[in-house]
Curated annotation (Swiss-Prot):
Annotated Gene3D superfamilies: P-loop containing nucleotide triphosphate hydrolases (3.40.50.300)
Protein name: Nucleotide-binding protein Bcer98_3698
Family per similarity comment: Belongs to the RapZ-like family.
Pfam family, one: RapZ-like_N
Ligand binding (GTP): D65, L66, R67, G68
Binding site for ATP: G14, M15, S16, G17, A18, G19, K20, T21
GO MF entry, a single one: ATP binding
Origin superkingdom: Bacteria
Function: Displays ATPase and GTPase activities.
Organism (species): Bacillus cytotoxicus (strain DSM 22905 / CIP 110041 / 391-98 / NVH 391-98)
Keywords: ATP-binding, GTP-binding, Nucleotide-binding
Amino acid sequence: MTENNDIKMVIITGMSGAGKTVALQSFEDLGYFCVDNLPPMLLPKFVELMADSKSKMNKVALGIDLRGREFFEHLWGALDDLSERTWIIPHILFLDAKDSTLVTRYKETRRSHPLAPTGLPLKGIEAERGLLTDMKARANIVLDTSDLKPKELREKIVQLFSTETEQAFRVNVMSFGFKYGIPIDADLVFDVRFLPNPYYIPHMKPLTGLDEEVSSYVLKFNETHKFLEKLTDLITFMLPHYKREGKSQLVIAIGCTGGQHRSVTLAEYLGKHLKPDYSVHVSHRDVEKRKGH
C-alpha cells in the first residue's frame, strides 16, 4: 500500500439503541464500504483482504457489537495491529445516549435489550455501559444521540466525516425509453412523448439526442421551450427542499418512447441547467438500443 491508497476506517460502536444502524446508513451515503456486526476477531483478516484487494476500497465503516468481554481482548489486539499499519487511518466513533432515552427507545420499538432479553431494559443498559467504559475512553469521537432525531444524527455524521465534495447534494438526470420500462430508482419521472418525434424523419432515425441535428430539432419547437421553462422552474424549486430533508441524491428520469431522441435531448438540457448549482451526473439508459420507437 502507498500513501495514495490510504484507507480511512471508521469503527462504529457504542450503546445498543444509540443509533448504529442510522450511522451505518449515513456512512454508506458518503460512499463508505459498510459491514455491520463484524466480530472483532475477524478485523485483522478483513484488513488483510483490504490490503490485497485491487479495488478502490479506500473508505470503510465497520459496525462492531461488543457484548462479551472476550470480544474486547480481540478488539484491543486488532486496534494495536492497525496502529502499526501506516496505510490505514482508523477512527472509533462511539454512540451514546442517556439511560432514560435508551429505555424510551426500547419501549417504543418493543425490543428487548440484548443484555437483558427477559428483564428490564435499564438492567441491560447498566450492564452494557459498564462493559463499554474502556471502549468509550479510547474512542476518537463520542457522539451523544439523546436529543438527535435520525435525520439530525445523519447530518451530524456528514458534518464530521465528509469532505466538501461528499457533502454535495447529487442530482442524477437520466433519459430512458418507456418501451423498456420506467427506471426503478427514479424519484421523479417526466414523460416527454408529447413532443415532436425526430424518429419519423428518416435521416434522424439512427441518430440520438446527443447529435446536434437531433437536439436542435427537438429544441426548436415552442412546446419544448414552454415545457423546459416549467420543468426547470419546478426542479429548481424542489431541489433545495429535498436537500433540506436529508436526501443525499435525487434521480430525475425523463422518458420518451425509445429513449434515443427527445428524452436524451431534454436530459442533456436539464443537466446543463443544473450544473452551476449542483453536482450533476447525466446518463442515457437506453440510447444504444436501436430497436425503434
